[in-house]
């Protein structure tokens, strides 16, 4: 039986825009109110997916959410037909309208937390959609995220789908962006690292002062319980509050892991030595590489600006590892110099591939934000909805679909246009047929 990791990337939705909705996400705030290019954003994402298949990887795709979320606008008191709801919201609450138009579901690292069958008590892959309570625009996602995941992983024998955690900041959960897994091989049991920003029920614990800690210890513990992870399979590590206050809003902005490699910044964690000692103990026998990037070589500011740690580390079919990095890493002198050195250090990472995902980067999401990792075996892969796996023909279908339905410019003023609602629904209705998802969207039900 073969074992591997499959990346399921989020397809950028037709309403991709720069509204600066994410407080604590420096790039999102810095690019607020610029015009976006939804067509180019979607194509950049698709090209990244296609590039990974060309490296020999199995690559999946997850559909975007229906936006605007008119049901939420109506729940907030805007009435009448769709055009009337948009006009009222644009006039009375433009920030709320922008939030209900957000295409943030493209960052599928926040879609869910996934535990592979090698780690779970019942031998199934477990999924829990993230509740994303900390940001209003993202808190609208979990219900439909769950539907999409069930349509992609639609086999009770191999996949177990949980409801998202209670919708309260005490159990604030941001999904796989604060979770990584270390293992000797994908098919062997591993150690799942849950990184949290604060404890909700013990306010004596350290917490950031400037920006919010979006993930709580209690949420991470609940996910581990739901997924049936034993004590030997889970490590809970607090993120350094000081780096959250410097714009590190998720752990995947300051650390990333794959198999027996943990790649992280010197300032990433609060009690680094004890945390890594626990990881090493629970990892057990076998080579384990901790690659710590010193502040003297790459500052936190450069790490955030370039998204050095929001890269993907892939194990290629050859067995060597490679980093998928945004072109911003190549353009940053300190980060570029570090990556050039990294591939010579004798770790499993032997190459770096740069990819252009600028439309996503300007909204605060790099290559790792755009993907949800699922470690699986070939039997489990055979149970995945095949229309949600990228092949040459499916790539061509999706690329053509983007050409037919997406605008090449979207400004905040355009969000009041009722035609955008129909364009988006027409596009998504066709997409559910291409991806064979069934009726996952509210307008289809």
From Swiss-Prot:
InterPro entries, A to Z: AstB_sf, SuccinylArg_d-Hdrlase_AstB
Residues binding substrate, per UniProt: 19-28, 110, 137-138, 214, 252, 363
Enzyme class at the top of the EC tree: hydrolase
EC number, UniProt record: 3.5.3.23
Keyword Hydrolase: yes
Cited Pfam families: AstB
Keywords for the protein's UniProt record, in alphabetical order: Arginine metabolism, Hydrolase
Active-site residues, as the UniProt record annotates them: 174, 250, 369
Pathway: Amino-acid degradation; L-arginine degradation via AST pathway; L-glutamate and succinate from L-arginine: step 2/5
GO molecular function, one term: N-succinylarginine dihydrolase activity
UniProt keyword annotation of Nucleotide-binding present: no
Any one biological process term the GO annotation gives: arginine catabolic process to glutamate
Catalytic activity, as annotated: N(2)-succinyl-L-arginine + 2 H2O + 2 H(+) = N(2)-succinyl-L-ornithine + 2 NH4(+) + CO2
Similarity comment: Belongs to the succinylarginine dihydrolase family.
Function as written in the Swiss-Prot or TrEMBL entry: Catalyzes the hydrolysis of N(2)-succinylarginine into N(2)-succinylornithine, ammonia and CO(2).
Assembly and interaction partners: Homodimer.
UniProt-listed NCBIfam families: arg_catab_astB, PRK13281.1
UniProt name for this protein: N-succinylarginine dihydrolase
Organism encoding this protein: Aeromonas hydrophila subsp. hydrophila (strain ATCC 7966 / DSM 30187 / BCRC 13018 / CCUG 14551 / JCM 1027 / KCTC 2358 / NCIMB 9240 / NCTC 8049)
Underlying gene: astB
